[in-house]
Structures are given as C-alpha cells and as structure tokens.
UniProtKB/Swiss-Prot annotation:
UniProt-listed Enzyme Commission number(s): 3.2.1.70
PANTHER family named among the record's database cross-references: ALPHA-AMYLASE FAMILY MEMBER, NEUTRAL AND BASIC AMINO ACID TRANSPORT PROTEIN RBAT
Localization in the cell: Cytoplasm
Protein name (database record): Glucan 1,6-alpha-glucosidase
Record site: Transition state stabilizer: 313
One Pfam family recorded for the sequence: Alpha-amylase
Function as written in the Swiss-Prot or TrEMBL entry: The physiological substrates may be short isomaltosaccharides.
Catalyses which reaction(s): Hydrolysis of (1->6)-alpha-D-glucosidic linkages in (1->6)-alpha-D-glucans and derived oligosaccharides
NCBIfam families for the chain: PRK10933.1
Coiled coil location: none
Molecular function GO labels: alpha-amylase activity; glucan 1,6-alpha-glucosidase activity
Length: 536
C-alpha cells in the first residue's frame, strides 16, 4: 500500500464560530484560529478541518454558501484566510476545507439568476418540478419549496434556504471543480465533503443517497481537481457499509482518501428511530461488533476509514457515553485510547482534548440550531411535553458541540470579551479549560498529545491487523498484530470494576490511564481503566 501523510496524521476539527473571538463581537473568527495555532502545534495535530468560512447568510451556520470564493464578514476576509494558511504551514499544519456542494444558499448568484430567469442556464443548476412528491427534508417538513416567481417547486433536503444542486448538469460540475482548484492553488491540504453521498440523487425515484452516478461524479471530480495532489479527502457518508467505503476509498478507484462512516453513532438512539429517541446507556457489545466489522472488512490497501467520537453535529461523547462526574477525566482518556489505536485517521473535535461536555440548556431561547428548533416545534405540535423535548435536546442536540471553546477561567472562558456570546459558555468552564489542562501533567490533553505522537512514530498503527478479543461485555479488548509484534489494547467501558480474563506477558507500556501491571496481575479492571501494552 502506498503510504500518504494522512495515514499517520491526526486531524483537529474547528467550528470557527465557537473557537476564538478576537474582535469582541461574541463570534469566533479566522484571526482567532491563527492566534491559537501554537496550541494546536503543541497538541501535535497535522491538519485542521475547518468548518465552512465561506460567504454565507448563516441560515445553517455556514453550510449555506452564497459565494465559495469569498469569506463571510463575521469571520474576517480573504487576507485573514491567506494568513491562516501561511501561519499553519509554518507550523507543519495543513488546512482541510469543508466542501459543501450538495446545495448552496438561496442567496448564491446561481440561485438568484435561476429564480429570476427560468430560461437561464443557471436554472438547470438546481432541481425543479411542477408537482412535488412526498420527499421530506432532513430538517423536517417537505423537501420541496414553492417558488411563486416561476410557479414551480425547488428541492431542498436541508433548510428551504439551501436549494439542492443538480449534479446532472455538466457545466455546474465544471464550475465546482474550478472552485476546488481555486482553493487547491491557495495551498490547502484537502477537503472534507459534506453529505457527498447525496450528490447522485434522483428525486423522482426517491433515491436520495448512493445514487447510480455518485461514483462517476467522484472519479470525474478527482481527475479534474485534487487527484494530481497529495491531499486528504474525506466524504461524509451516513449510510456507508465497509463495501461501499471501499468504492469511495480504494486507491485504484481514484475517488477519495477515506470516509466518515456513522454506524457506531447510530447506537446513540433507538434502532430505526429518529435521533431524538436517544439511548443513554452505551451498548458496548454492539459497539465492539461495529468496530470489529469496520476494522476487519475495510482491509488494508482496499480502503481507509476515519476514527471519531465527536463533530459539530453530534453530542459530546463524554455526556452520552462517558462519565461527566467522578470519572470524567478517566473516561475521556479511556474513550480516546480505545479509538485512536485502531486503524484509520483520527479526528478530534475542538474541546474534546480537554473533556468538554454537553450544555445544560434550560429553554429554547438558549438555542441557535435550526434542526433542534424545528424538532421542538414539530414535537410540541405532535403532543410531546416541552420537558421531554428539552431533555432530548440537552442530550443529542447539535448546539451541545457548538458552545464556545473553553480557554481559561476568565470571562466567557477566554473565548470573547463580548457581553454576550453567540451561544452561551458552558458553566463548567472554570474547571474545564485549556489553561488548567496544560498546567496539569496528568490531564486529558496530554493523553491526546501522547496518542497523536504514537501514531506519528509507529507504523504498526497503520499496518497491523486487528483482532477483537472475547471479554466481559463492558470490556473492550483488541490486539494489533504485524509480523512478530503484538500490541494489546484494553478498555473498561463502564463505571464498575470488571474482570479481565487475559493472560499475557507484558513487554512495555505504550500508553495508560491506570496502573496496568496491577490490572494484569490480579485480573481486575477499575472503572474506565484503559491501556496499550506491547506483549511477547
């Protein structure tokens, strides 16, 4: 298998609105990100995935783009973006842009032209019909919006301000590739592709994702843009299986570097139920089965996976699956060790490395997220109590991940000097912040730093086979094996003591949040014990 820089990299996701504010308006900005590059260099990450900073009316926090080649005012300007790229490069950090090409904003010049002039070439950049079918928007309600100017309906799988693009149109596709090359020429390190599995949709046949032309489009995109460069490309593919992931990420197919698959995230809610019907208790045996499947069926050389617990759309993993009380630090380290020592490229979401948690939202006034607000409205209309609705939002709503980054114990956690930040700062910021983490040599931060360094220095993390070991339900243990080397990873994913029924001869400890020698000797794992050892 040809090795690429991203096989040994760890990527850090930044949600710009919430990372660092330098102009006191309560909203993060590009200068704020640049000001924190030394911190990210200390952590050791090789790339930043930057959530959208393009010109946008911010209906969906930047995932509604009005101009792909301009920066939205609240984040700064193109000079700030160029400076971020330059300063990041000086520190050995690449910038991965968020590519949102399933849809644009309804304020994009293409859509304005399409609406004003039904006979224009831009009209065919979007999807129109006379009689809508029953397709539904992911944000609730119909996926079709009536446009009185032309007496037709346009398709929007997200908000009505996010009309879907028509990838059947070759001129549109070329314009997208030209835009990608604009950013590649600026020196970016790659693209994270938002809901990329939806670009091959056929609405008339109710085909939303994994449409028949999807992979042809990606091959064309690869050849026309990033294929000539050593860039990281990752597709957001909610419905992917290992077989589908191979189509995207097998190097011989010339599509993407890797995928984000979400099968493990599905354990956050009841099977076949909407995400709001959350399950607080992690089904560890099911998690083992899912990770085992992805580690063994997406074979080395035939595809590549991403490893993540958190992103801007998901609740904080500590709040849903970890422990936010007595074992907060220990469970955060355990979940990190469990994930980062598998095969794949790990992604850290801002604040994960210091153990940030969900926000205790009291009412809808504290929310910004369009998805949560739409859910609340729909659920309340359908007879759910506001208490039940808020309970779901507190556990699973997208704003949990989007509260401001907690830098120190000063006003607004050091994020902003504004009287009011765009989302409230989590009240636990005086205890959970970067400054405190850096001062404590035993903090979660240094476990992440160690895991990132291990990946850079050890080929076995890329090459070694994966073998899930039979253990008690709440114990997740696996071997990584390559040539004569054996590495044992053990994690107690629970608040209880567990029995470890493995006899091994330890050679050395690579990383631990516990006294692993004691655990191996008496076969007892304390709550949230986690370690990786080299064995004979």
């Amino acid at each position: 298998m040809q090795k690429h820089w991203w096989h040994k990299a760890t990527v850090y996701q930044i949600y710009p609105k919430s990372f660092m504010d330098t102009n006191g308006d309560g909203i993060g900005d590009l200068k704020g990100i640049t000001s924190k590059l030394d911190y990210l260099q200390k952590l050791g990450v090789m790339a930043i995935w930057l959530s959208p900073v393009y010109d946008s009316p911010m209906d969906d926090n930047g995932y509604d783009i009005a101009n792909y080649e301009a920066i939205t005012d609240i984040f700064g300007n193109m000079a700030d973006m160029d400076n971020l790229l330059t300063q990041a490069k000086m520190r050995g950090i690449k910038i991965i842009m968020d590519l949102v090409v399933n849809h644009t904003s309804d304020e994009h010049a293409w859509f304005i032209e399409a609406r004003e002039h039904p006979d224009s070439s831009e009209r065919d950049y979007y999807i129109w019909c006379d009689q809508p079918n029953d397709l539904e928007s992911i944000f609730g309600g119909s996926a079709w919006q009536y446009d009185d100017k032309s007496d037709q309906y346009y398709l929007h799988f997200f908000s009505k301000k996010q009309p879907d693009l028509n990838w059947e149109n070759a001129n549109l596709r070329q314009k997208i590739y030209d835009m990608m090359n604009f950013w590649i020429d600026k020196g970016i390190g790659g693209f994270r592709m938002d809901v990329i599995d939806m670009i091959g949709k056929i609405p008339a046949q109710h085909i939303v994702s994994n449409g028949p032309k999807l992979h042809a489009y990606l091959k064309e995109m690869n050849a026309a843009s990033f294929g000539q460069h050593d860039l990281l490309t990752v597709g957001e593919t909610w419905g992917a299986t290992p077989e589908i992931a191979k189509q995207y990420s097998n190097p011989v197919n010339h599509e993407l570097s890797m995928v984000f698959q979400f099968e493990h995230i599905g354990l956050q809610h009841k099977p076949e139920a909407p995400k709001w019907d959350y399950v607080k208790e992690l089904n560890v045996p099911a998690l083992k089965t899912i990770f085992n499947k992805w580690q063994t069926e997406l074979e080395l050389g035939q595809g590549w996976n991403s490893l993540f617990w958190n992103n801007h759309d998901l609740p904080r993993v500590l709040s849903i699956w970890g422990n936010t009380g007595k074992y907060r630090e220990k469970s955060a380290k355990a979940l990190a060790i469990l994930l980062h020592l598998m095969r794949g490229t790990p992604y850290i979401y801002q604040g994960e490395e210091i153990g940030m948690t969900n926000y205790p939202f009291k009412d809808l006034n504290e929310l910004d997220d369009i998805e949560s607000l739409n859910y609340a409205k729909e659920a309340f209309t359908n007879g759910k109590s506001m208490e039940t609705i808020m309970d779901s939002i507190r556990m699973i709503g997208r704003d949990n991940a989007r509260t401001p980054m907690q830098w120190d114990a000063s006003q607004n956690a050091g994020f902003s000097t504004a009287d009011k930040t765009w989302l409230p700062v989590n009240p636990n910021y005086k205890d959970i912040n970067v400054q405190a983490a850096l001062k404590n040599s035993n903090s979660i931060f240094y476990t992440y730093q160690q895991l990132i360094q291990l990946r850079k220095e050890n080929d076995w993390l890329v090459d070694a086979d994966f073998e899930l070991l039979p253990t008690a339900d709440k114990v997740f243990a696996y071997l990584r094996k390559v040539r004569e080397e054996r590495y044992l990873i053990v994690v107690n994913v629970s608040d209880q003591e567990e029995v470890l029924e493995i006899d091994v001869d330890k050679q050395e400890t690579l990383i631990s949040n516990t006294n692993e020698s004691a655990a191996l000797a008496n076969h007892k794992l304390q709550p949230w014990d986690a370690f990786c050892i080299k064995i004979n």
